[in-house]
Amino acid sequence: MQLFVRAQGLHTLEVTGQETVAQIKAHVASLEGISPEDQVVLLAGSPLEDEATLGQCGVEALTTLEVAGRMLGG
């Protein structure tokens, strides 16, 4: 299935649904140079856990995931 990932740019990925969020972060890192540790992947505004698969998160074909930079604060 196709999945859209919006980080600094919009990317189209071909996935099976068995990939983990951590694998998507690694792919975004290779495309845009953003460290996976500095990424937050969002589905409809909710952050996704690294260990979860796309299928477990409810990601369907043609879904757009947002990738935001982690905010540092104290």
Curated annotation (Swiss-Prot):
Lineage top rank: taxon: Eukaryota
CDD domains in UniProt: Ubl_FUBI
Family: Belongs to the ubiquitin family.
Anything else known: This protein is synthesized with ribosomal S30 as its C-terminal extension.
Summary of the function given for this chain in its UniProt record: Confers arsenite resistance.
Entry protein name: Ubiquitin-like protein FUBI
Organism of provenance: Cricetulus griseus (Chinese hamster)
Gene field: FAU
